[in-house]
Amino acid sequence: MWADDYKVDGFRFDLMGHQPKDVMVEALAEVRKIDENTLFYGEGWDFGEVADNARFDQANQINMAGTEIGTFSDRLRDAVRGGSPFDGGVDSEGNHPLRFNQGFGNAAIANEETKVDQDSINGRLHNQDLVRLGMAGNLAEYVLIDYKGDTKLGKNVDYNGAPAGYTKMPSENISYVSKHDNQTLWDNNAYKIATGTSSAERARMQSVSLSTVMLGQGIPFIHMGSELLRSKSMQRDSYDSGDWYNRVMFDGTDNNWNVGLPREDKDGANWDLIKTIIADSTAKPDADDIELTKQQFLELLKIRSSSELFRLDTADEVMKRVDFRNVGEDQVEGLIVMSIDDGVSAGDDLDPANDAIVAVVNSTNESQSFKITGATGFTLHDVQQNSADDTVKGASFAAETFTVPALTTAVFVQAQGDAQGVGLPVDNSDKDVSSIPPYGQTTVYVRGDMNGWNPVEGWAMSFVSNGVYSVTGSLEAGNYGFKFADADWKTPNFGCDSVELANGSINLGSDGNCQLSVAEAGSYTFTLNAINELDDNVEKAVVSVTKN
């Protein structure tokens, strides 16, 4: 009815993860018979009584990959905002997780609780990896270099024990940094930003945070009023708090900051911290801050709309065109440098005006310069050359180097001439794809009769390279059934029904499991080549067992 009679062409599903996947897929197919461009998206959270597919295959983030149904991505959200929506209260050391868990968008200046130990620094650098991955559509197969210098697929980057990258197409990535649940972006930042930081700097942090969504691949989701520095007076959950906390001042005269303490049932544990924060007069923006943020947002919208390169349709296009510089062990914290190629090596000419785009997101409180060897002919985007923000007008390019002021996102374009030019191709020279474990951080075991079918440490396979895992163990003469599996019998979990046997291997039978007959006791090496998990052109895993 809604699609046919009322011409509704987009549907958002609350707690979609509590629905069966097949119901959602079937519903989309039916609605697209009326309008083939209908959009489905929803909350693919995995929790509660249906968690881990306990009752059916859920419509959660991981399962919805490949369905063309979008899911909200908490990966970039948490990385930009800092911490998680569940932070609150005081920890065992008397510190506030809501305060010390700074994110990419608000960590320019350390606050009094900011942690500077190596684990905390690594955590912030890991956040930058999550931001990059989110801006690349959160693709499971996207190749990036992490903060340790390791080449990884998106699905092998960690997010609280789950794969950070999980989509198969960018449109499945609903990218956001604020919505009706939990604190607004302004209020969340107020928890993190150092005391005494000017309201103008706070407003710039808001714009920088929003730019990670507006310039990334996927579908941007913008919370009403984000461009107006909207506050709900630190209210975490405002669905039942009335207009006093939920109002949006569309005239830009005020942002509803500090109109009262939030409700005790949701935020009582944070009242002492909130009272300290609202006592800081710099935490309240003025009308000029609000107006500039609004204009910066409208400019980001114009920039996104100006080029198809910000709206790539397929994973293949993203992986051929989108690259990140300032990566690895020596990267500058707080700096994202993203290039999008439209040169001849990228394929079709998607942007007839430009051969390449470089977006520099500087969330630090200092001007940053970054050199990309081979970059030529870039100029600041004409929207920003005529910006309402005088600061971004100071961004420049010269001698292969992009320079961007503090707390600023600048977009540079390489204008196309009479025909498609060289552009700025993805740099694969420093990416070692042979070092990518097909199963990421998951430990693969040989589990079978030789170890009671348990995930025994001595039978944990080591990743070698190029998709190959190996383990050597002692076996007595006899017959053994076994599988290649993880500790939870999830992924991987297979025997020899659907694999190929490598040359030189002892013959392996199959009855669902692999069947090995050992004629002589001794040392045996088991290998698994799972390159098929990384290369769609390889159909099956290849396995072998050899006597040493």
Spell out what each predicted region is:
Residues 201-202, 300-308, 365-397, 406:
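C-terminal accessory region downstream of the catalytic core in glycan-modifying enzymes
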Residues 154-358, 363-371:
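Loop/helix patches that line or flank the sugar-binding groove of alpha-linked glycan CAZymes
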Residues 1-19:
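Active-site groove signature of glycoside hydrolases
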Residues 433-479, 487-513:
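Aromatic-rich carbohydrate-binding modules that target alpha-glucans
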Residues 395-430, 524-534:
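C-terminal beta-strand-rich structural cap/linker in extracellular carbohydrate-active enzymes
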Residues 308, 364-366, 376, 416-418, ...:
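Acidic glycine-/aspartate-rich tracts in secreted/extracellular proteins
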Residues 15-166, 226-273, 348, 373-376:
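Active-site-proximal helices and loops of the catalytic beta/alpha 8
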Residues 357, 366, 376, 476-478, ...:
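A glycine-anchored, Pro-Gly-centered beta-turn/N-cap motif
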